[in-house]
């Protein structure tokens, strides 16, 4: 990470969120939904369940005490050995600092530790920066795997080399 890690007073800390982080998780998700125009939104009960999920998780990057970015991993029961990356979001004032890369590193390592074979994700054509990040990380096109009406791109990555 660039400036926010080099000599800055604002320490970056990434945590696997729990129920004590619920307000920050809902705040980041709300901003993401509005920015991207998400139609299928996670319910409050769904977010709470994910925060307690052992086979998935929700990570928040904090800069100082400010929640700056998030990502979630949730099981894909219809695809054995797979989970789905969702809601990668970095607040505008923290973009370009490597937070998305750090969150994806943690998510992918967690998926590998769970013994999963694949991480899937969907996106929209207009999220070009995110799509480029995914492709640089080795995500490759795959068949549609869900019924998300807004998704136009479907990618997956093997978790084991």
Regions found by a protein language model. Name each.
Residues 2-86, 91-92, 104-106, 110, ...:
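Acetyl-CoA-dependent GNAT
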Residues 91-93, 97, 125:
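Active-site acidic-Proline motif in GNAT/NAT acetyltransferases
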Residues 22, 97, 128:
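Loop/helix-junction capping segments adjacent to catalytic residues or to phosphate/diphosphate-binding pockets
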Residues 97, 101, 105:
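Residues forming the Rossmann-fold NAD(P)(H) cofactor-binding site
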Residues 101, 113, 125-143, 148-151:
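Conserved active-site alpha-helix within GNAT-family acetyltransferase domains
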Residues 104, 111-123:
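Conserved GNAT acetyl-CoA-binding A-motif
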Residues 153-159:
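Short, basic/aromatic-enriched C-terminal tail that caps enzymatic domains
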């Amino acid at each position: 990470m660039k400036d926010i890690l080099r000599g800055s007073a604002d320490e970056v800390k990434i945590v696997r969120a729990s129920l004590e982080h619920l307000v920050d998780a809902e705040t980041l998700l709300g901003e993401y939904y509005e920015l991207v125009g998400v139609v299928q939104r996670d319910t409050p009960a769904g977010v709470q369940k994910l925060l307690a999920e052992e086979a998935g998780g929700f990570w928040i990057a904090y800069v100082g005490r400010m929640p700056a970015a998030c990502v979630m991993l949730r099981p894909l029961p219809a695809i054995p050995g797979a989970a789905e990356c969702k809601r990668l979001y970095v607040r505008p004032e923290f973009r370009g600092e490597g937070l998305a890369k750090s969150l994806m590193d943690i998510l992918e390592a967690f998926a590998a530790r769970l013994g999963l074979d694949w991480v899937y994700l969907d996106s929209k054509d207009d999220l070009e920066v995110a799509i480029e990040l995914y492709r640089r990380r080795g995500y490759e096109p795959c068949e549609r795997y869900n019924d998300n009406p807004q998704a136009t791109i479907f990618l997956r990555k093997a978790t084991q080399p």
